[in-house]
C-alpha cells in the first residue's frame, strides 16, 4: 500500500488528524490494532475544552456533540466540607467546557471517515516502523489472520498511545521525563442520574473524590486510592459508602445506582522530547501522559494535531519542512503548560503521605476558593488555552 500520510492509531488524535487532512485533499491511511467495537466502547475522558469543541465543529464532526454534549459553565471545589463554585465562563470571557465521552467522539470520527469512503483498517497491528530517516518510511503491518503487509508513506504519525510501537521508537532516541504520583483513582461508571449538574472536586481527610458525569443518566465517580489498590477488596456497597463520606455535605444526597464497570487508574506524568524521529511524528498519548485531574489528556491530543495538520500540508504541497522541524517545540510548550496545571490540580486536591506537603496543599486549596485571581488562573487553564 502507498499513501501520503500513514496514521498509526484510530483514537481521537489519529482520527481527528485524518479528518483535518482529508478536508485539504491529503491522502491518508489509518491503521488500528483493535476492533471497531473496542475503540467505540472504550470509556475514557469526557471533558472537552472550548478549543477542542471549536475545532471539531470546524472539521464537520461536531453535530452530535452539540446535540448531546452537556455544556458546563463552572466546576465545584469542595474543601473542609464546604462547596465553592468556580464560575469558569464568567472568569474567561464566556468560554465553556462540554462533557461528551471520548468513545462518542471516536464513533463520530469513525462514521465520518467511513462515510467518505477513506481507508481505515481495524484489527491491523503495526509491528514496526522502518526507514524513518528516508523519504519513504514504511509501517510493517500484521492483519488479524496473521498475514503481513506494508504501508509506504511520505510521513508517519504515531498516534497509537502510550504502549504503542511509535512511542517506543521515539523514546529510544529521546529524553523521557517522568513522574509517578503516590496515589491512583478507583473509578466507577454507574447507571444513575448525576447528583449535580457540574463536576465536583472534593478534598477530604480520607482522600480525593470526584463526581462527574457522562450523560443525563450515567454518572462517573472516582475515589483516591493507592497505586496497588486491590479492586476486588471493594464491594459496590463499600464504594458508595466512601463516595458518600468524601462527597457529602449538609443538605445534599449522592444518588446511588448499579455500578456498570470499575477500575484503578494510576497517576503519572510522562513527556518524550522531541516528539519526532525522522519522518515519524508523535501525537497524543504516544508523546505525553498527564494525570487526569486537569482533564487535559484528550484535549492535548487534539491540540497536537491542530498544530501538526497545517505543517503536514505545507510539507506535502510546498516541500516546506520548517513547520515539521518546529512541531515538537511548539507542541511541547503547550504540553508542559498542561503538565504544570495537571500537577498543580493533582497535588492540591489529593491527600499526600508527606504530611508537610499535605498541609501545604490544603492551604493552597483554601486560598483558591477565597481568591478570584487564583480562580481565574485555574479557569483559564481548565477551559483551555487558545489552539495554535
Region roles according to the model:
Residues 208, 269-271, 287-298:
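Glycine-rich phosphate/pyrophosphate-binding beta-alpha loops
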Residues 266-282:
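FAD-binding beta-loop-beta segment adjacent to the flavin cofactor pocket
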Residues 111, 118, 124-128, 133-263, ...:
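Conserved FAD-binding catalytic core of PHBH/FMO-like flavoproteins
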Residues 22-43:
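Glycine-rich FAD pyrophosphate-binding loop
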Residues 295, 310-388:
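C-terminal helical "tail/cap" subdomain of flavin- and related membrane-associated enzymes
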Residues 1-13:
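Beta1/beta-strand and adjacent pyrophosphate-binding region of the FAD-binding site
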Residues 41-44, 49-116, 339:
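Active-site-adjacent segment of FAD-dependent monooxygenases/related oxidoreductases
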